[in-house]
């Protein structure tokens, strides 16, 4: 959504071979956006209906090449995403877990520019919708665990010649597994780890199938009082398998990135909601942009 690599750009765009390589590097494979869940990424709420509203601001002026070095491209990438998620945790049990499901609908605005060139794209639209019909969550005395199975649908507009496209033009299966551990009975100190694995289908334009992606999100949190919780959140992402198809660029190069930053959770009793504010800075990037992201999330029970 925030980032996805283009395929091969035709000569009709009047770009040289070196610029083609830069633009292909500027997009990565996966639908899932790194680092959006935070310090309790693997904890799900008790049975009920919930609305979660993510607002993401991503800025990058650094493009990493296939060796992880800073590219000569003078990148200017700005992305804003407003994402609505509806979560339903039922009172039904399966394998001892609460059974639930969720639906995620993103709105994305992307401005992609390489300075000192004619490469300048800007698009706003609905991104690829995620449907997770299977969400299982367990809650122990000092732990939480969760697993899920979902599919991204190619609902967002996709143009392989436009790196600002809000969609990826592919179906993606996503598997999720994670857990949270609480170090005290009062659950004031926690550590959480959430992993996701994406398997991508063929792009609906051109001849391209992106390699699988592995993501993890981790966090350590400390509850200060009934209002505030603070912590450190981080994430990582690796491409696990090669790209394939005639339009694959550097198919054996696997992109990656890591990020880390502070987070604060604020409980707002007046509106029965929790607000999280998180800032992350990326490092260790390869074959993709490397930037900074601010995420503001509102979670509110509807039932």
Residue ranges, per PLM feature:
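Outer membrane beta-barrel transmembrane domains
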Residues: 203-303
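Residues on the lipid-exposed face of transmembrane beta-strands in outer-membrane beta-barrel proteins
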Residues: 53, 84-88, 131-136, 149-151, ...
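Outer-membrane beta-barrel biogenesis signature
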Residues: 25-50
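Residues that define the transmembrane beta-barrel architecture of outer-membrane proteins
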Residues: 47, 76-84, 120-130, 167-173, ...
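Transmembrane beta-strands of outer-membrane beta-barrel pores
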Residues: 55-61, 88, 105-111, 151-157, ...
